[in-house]
Amino acid sequence: MSINVEQAIIHSISQDGEGQLSCRLRPQPLLNSQAVEAMLEELHQTYTTKAGKGFGHFGINGEDGEANTKFEEALTTYRSGELGFVEFSGIAGKLLQEELAKYDFSTGGFLLLSCYTYMTSDYLFVSLLNAKSSMTVLDDMELSQNTHLDLNNVQLAARIDLTEWQADPESKKYISFIRGRAGRKVADFFLDFMGCVEGVNTKAQNKSLMNAVEDFVGNSELTKDERQQARERVFDYCTERCDEGASIQIKDLADELADQGMDSFYDFAQGGNYELEEEFPGDKPTLRQLKKFSGTGGGVTLSFDGQHLGERVIYDPVSDTIIIKGVPANLKDQLDRRLKGE
């Protein structure tokens, strides 16, 4: 299903020779052209399927320190019809410029804001895009350098579910955002300019769900194969929700398992010490552990499907060893050739 683009605009934030940032505001929205729709559709798909996103909400002064409420106030005024989209986007551009000026690592970029509808929800997509140089061949076979937006490597982006925000202002997850790379805080300024604070620990919720599923199947009378099928059903449901950009709902998941003959998961999950929310965003890297075991350390990397544990892969925790029966053919060939060489 395609998105329905309502408004979109791009502003430029650049640095002059003295290192001062300035924001050049576009005076009117982007034309609703095929190029604009294609770009936003690509960004929507890329963003929706991107793993490891964080989730939060607008901060509140006092509760969340000195929260920056200017972005939320401008967005509220825009949604009420008292402020035009161009004017709202201009306020956002100036707020981002002010936030970027506090740091010495940024040279700016192109601020994209777009309001669009997908399925039954309205969204505001906000991203700081970078330009990238590339080479092209002209008609006379000469090379020419041009510049284009780097849509394949978006690192600074957030999406506000406007429908959820206005229907449930107390929600802690109506803003999603791309997390910064491990150990880096570069993306923090992007959340600060919007006044966003993290509200849901997505990885922790997904880990708790995995623990609940493992305990549930472990306490059941299911066979080994049936237990693995249950894990895979949970994985399939959760990844489908991730791909759709929707939250995992414990009640729906329990119904999925009940259809497979595994009743009472909802009561089990809510009755334990799992501290699971009724619904929360999925995290594919964490959920993948339902189907696969993998680990790296000391120069050794090992990965195998969960169904092989106890059969092709034997783990002995006492001796701290793993025995693999039926070595993969390509690995066996490499090992045999190395032994012959020695």
Curated annotation (Swiss-Prot):
GO terms for MF: double-stranded DNA binding; single-stranded RNA binding
UniProt key word Cytoplasm: yes
Compartments where found: Cytoplasm, Nucleoid
Keywords assigned by UniProt, alphabetized: Cytoplasm
Keyword Cytoplasm: yes
This protein's GO CC annotations: bacterial nucleoid; cytoplasm
Family label: Belongs to the YejK family.
Protein name (database record): Nucleoid-associated protein Spea_1765
Source species: Shewanella pealeana (strain ATCC 700345 / ANG-SQ1)
